[in-house]
């Protein structure tokens, strides 16, 4: 989970908090409290007869069997026939204990693994090939998935909490996160002006505290700064990624998926049941962005999105029918009504 934030169980600031992150604390919010470093994603390549490949989803906690499963899927060399060499001069890894973690092997991020087929061992079945790996190998690869959170007007806050806390689903966090955002905005009326917020600073703070309002780009930007991480939102309608905090130099990245009206968190699941899902990624892990776009494209092809310019809404206060977010915005401006439901 994200550790350095102070004042509450997930980072609500104490009284008098200015909204700015002290320079001395930069870099502490993205790792666990205490001396144990965060388990970051490794960048490891493997070189085999067919070329050089980047391996996905590895860390010090990855088990050798998962590494060999990836290599098998990429190279077509079955785990039992692999020879893996590392270092200079290259030395063979001991592959006898397939449950050992990479952190206990002489491998580190940035290494190039040389993979060869051990000719002294029985060859794999002809059915085992680079593009036809057996199902057990395909299943051994980590997969990026979405986790559904309640559609209760606070899905953004629940989703952000889920990813920064390492996979904790707690919809009850929303009021606290809303108060956090209001306190940060109120602390800097110059930065968070009416031109930015679309309403006065005071009105915005009252508005965001309510449980019937939706979060969006402003709130994501604030949470990105507070948690000192890049928040990437992949849009299933346009199949694009909006990256908040991209240029801030953060070392961590979390991902949400957005269908036009609802946010869900994304996580990487591993086949080993003892390996917890990963929700916090290295900002250098661009593979996870590709995987997120693949998820979004699949959802778009299945039309799992809401066109916010054409969807039908009803004002839950006066029951007036509306079409699209523009009409809803105009209605809210004219009447002060902000509680809408999709028809």
Curated annotation (Swiss-Prot):
Its main location: cytoplasm. Residues 208-218 are annotated as: Variable-loop. It catalyses: Thiol-dependent hydrolysis of ester, thioester, amide, peptide and isopeptide bonds formed by the C-terminal Gly of ubiquitin (a 76-residue protein attached to proteins as an intracellular targeting signal). InterPro entries: OTU1_Ubl, OTU_dom, Papain-like_cys_pep_sf, Ubiquitin-like_domsf, Znf_C2H2_type. The keyword Hydrolase applies. A zinc finger (C2H2-type) spans 313-337. Residues 149-155 are annotated as: Cys-loop. Residues 286-291 are annotated as: S2 site. CDD domains: OTU_OTU1, Ubl_OTU1. The keyword Metal-binding applies. Residues 258-262 are annotated as: His-loop. The UBAX-like region mediates the interaction with VCP. The C2H2-type zinc finger mediates specificity for 'Lys-27'-, 'Lys-29'- and 'Lys-33'-linked polyubiquitin chains but not for 'Lys-11'-linked ubiquitin chains. Selectivity for 'Lys-11'-linked ubiquitin chains is provided by recognition of the sequence surrounding 'Lys-11' in ubiquitin. The S2 site region provides specificity for longer 'Lys-11'-linked ubiquitin chains. This is Ubiquitin thioesterase OTU1. It comes from Mus musculus.
